[in-house]
C-alpha cells in the first residue's frame, strides 16, 4: 500500500511539473498592424468582428406578432437590444425581417456576397402556430441548405436570445470592447 501511494504521488508530481504554465506559453501576436485592438489583455481577440451571422425573422409590426401576445413595441425593442448586444460582443449581424406573404427572393438576395459563419431563424417564425408561417419556416431552412450548405443553422428562443444562440457554437475567447462587430 505504501508503494502504491508513493508511485501515485510521484506520478502526480511528474504530471504537475510537465504541465505548461501561463509563463511557458508562447506569446501570441494578436495585434497586427492596422488592428483596432489595443495590446491590453481582455479587450480584444483576433476573432472580434470576423464572424458573420444572419437571422431571418418576422417584422415587429407583422399581424402574427400581435396574435402571439406581444406588442410590436416589445418585439422591436427586443430585436434592437439583441442586435446591439451581438455587435457589442464582437459579432457581425444582419437581421432579415419579412413575413410569409413576402418572397423568399428577398432573403436569398440578402445572403449573397457575404461569407456567413452561420445562419439563423428567429422564434417569431419558429414558434408561430400559423400554418403559413410554419411553411415559411420550412422554406427558409431549405433555402439555407441550398445557399449556405456548410453553415450551421442557429435558433434563438426569444427576441433577445440570438447572442445566446451564436455563443453556443461560436464563443469568442476574449472580450471585444475595443473591436466590436458590425450591423450588416
Tell what function each PLM region has.
Residues 34-66:
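N-terminal, charge-rich interaction modules
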Residues 1-27:
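Fungal secretory targeting signals
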Residues 104-118, 175-184:
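Short, electropositive alpha-helical surface patch
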Residues 136-175:
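Ser/Thr/Gly-rich flexible loops in soluble cytosolic domains mediating phosphotransfer, phosphorylation
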Residues 81-92:
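Short helix-loop-beta junction
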Residues 63-78:
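Glycine- and acidic-residue-enriched helix-capping/strand-helix junction motifs
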Residues 93-102, 154-159:
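Short beta->alpha junction loops
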Amino acid at each position: 500500500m505504501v508503494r502504491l501511494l508513493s508511485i501515485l504521488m510521484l506520478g502526480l508530481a511528474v504530471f504537475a511539473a510537465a504541465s505548461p504554465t501561463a509563463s511557458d506559453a508562447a506569446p501570441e501576436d494578436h495585434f497586427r498592424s492596422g488592428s483596432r485592438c489595443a495590446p491590453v489583455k481582455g479587450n480584444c481577440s483576433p476573432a472580434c468582428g470576423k464572424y458573420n451571422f444572419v437571422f431571418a425573422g418576422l417584422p415587429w409590426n407583422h399581424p402574427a406578432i400581435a396574435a402571439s401576445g406581444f406588442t410590436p413595441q416589445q418585439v422591436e425593442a427586443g430585436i434592437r437590444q439583441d442586435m446591439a448586444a451581438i455587435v457589442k460582443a464582437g459579432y457581425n449581424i444582419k437581421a432579415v425581417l419579412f413575413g410569409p406573404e413576402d418572397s423568399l427572393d428577398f432573403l436569398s438576395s440578402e445572403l449573397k456576397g457575404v461569407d456567413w459563419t452561420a445562419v439563423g431563424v428567429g422564434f417569431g417564425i419558429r414558434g408561430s402556430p400559423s400554418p403559413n408561417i410554419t411553411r415559411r419556416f420550412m422554406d427558409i431552412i431549405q433555402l439555407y441548405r441550398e445557399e449556405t450548405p456548410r453553415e450551421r443553422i442557429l435558433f434563438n428562443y426569444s427576441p433577445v436570445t440570438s447572442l445566446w444562440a451564436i455563443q453556443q457554437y461560436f464563443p469568442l475567447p476574449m472580450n471585444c470592447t475595443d473591436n466590436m462587430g458590425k450591423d450588416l
